[in-house]
Amino acid sequence: MEHFDVAIIGLGPAGSALARKLAGKMQVIALDKKHQCGTEGFSKPCGGLLAPDAQRSFIRDGLTLPVDVIANPQIFSVKTVDVAASLTRNYQRSYININRHAFDLWMKSLIPASVEVYHDSLCRKIWREDDKWHVIFRADGWEQHISARYLVGADGANSMVRRHLYPDHQIRKYVAIQQWFAEKHPVPFYSCIFDNEITDCYSWSISKDGYFIFGGAYPMKDGQTRFTTLKEKMSAFQFQFGKAVKSEKCTVLFPSRWQDFVCGKDNAFLIGEAAGFISASSLEGISYALDSAEILRAVLLKQPEKSNAAYWRATRKLRLKLFGKIVKSRCLTAPALRKWIMRSGVAHIPQLKDYPTRFTSPTSRM
């Protein structure tokens, strides 16, 4: 049985960033259910927008995005829709439109060869024995058993590591549903949709590489029905759908209290969405995945005597920021307050009507 310093379960943005940062400094093994390349296998349903905080993480690490990760077009505003109030407003945003699956695979490709990575693998069992973490996983057609001093759960909303560490922990969950359609809108756009009759979270749309993606986060029990109902309502706001090219769904966490942020214990750590590090106001998680990976890197390399306590303290600022997102979410999902904010016109950028969308030469108008 092989022994490692660190075993990382999951190679989304959080796990990939941590594996890359620990490479050459600690002996690391990393397991991921995605394939190494291509579109086969698991891919995470996601609107695919890189927030400014995530962009800052790449600046800090000296990384630039390759062109095959960036999607077309780049959109500079979010069309915010209040369905019940029949209000639409445009707010400036500085997101980068990306292909999420290509982004995840690119993040994995940055992990140096010194890290032992198993793609298309399945973690079957974890337990703690003799001050070590033991992991049984299936990869390359057979089961393997390894041990590690530190275990890191970077395995997302349905984290096996979180369930093992906190079997009684309850956090609000939604089913995120997305459908892809051939783009029919004359002007591509990104939208954020609020309808309290459908969900107390929110829905979204994004134009991407010739497709129109429509999705949202809905109650687990009847999410599909609510999603379909909202699609029907959106025709009143000039949303155009047609026949779905692809449908996706996954579980998404929705932290609603301070106790929803859990960081680990007994030399096991949680990063990214597995720790509850996801914005309640936007469901954006990439920036917090990257930030928590950087925080844990610093803790593990120092190897303090009480590493879990050190990680808990080090994430306090991050957790406070995310708690602020919980407060913001409650404001955004309160119908009366949201209606008042949108009607006030604060930060709204009106779109000019009957204005040429392309520059034309003087002769072309003759």
From Swiss-Prot:
<dbReference type="InterPro" id="IPR002938">
    <property type="entry name" value="FAD-bd"/>
</dbReference>
<comment type="similarity">
    <text>Belongs to the CbrA family.</text>
</comment>
<protein>
    <recommendedName>
        <fullName>Protein CbrA</fullName>
    </recommendedName>
</protein>
<dbReference type="GO" id="GO:0071949">
    <property type="term" value="F:FAD binding"/>
</dbReference>
<dbReference type="Pfam" id="PF01494">
    <property type="entry name" value="FAD_binding_3"/>
</dbReference>
<dbReference type="InterPro" id="IPR036188">
    <property type="entry name" value="FAD/NAD-bd_sf"/>
</dbReference>
<dbReference type="InterPro" id="IPR050407">
    <property type="entry name" value="Geranylgeranyl_reductase"/>
</dbReference>
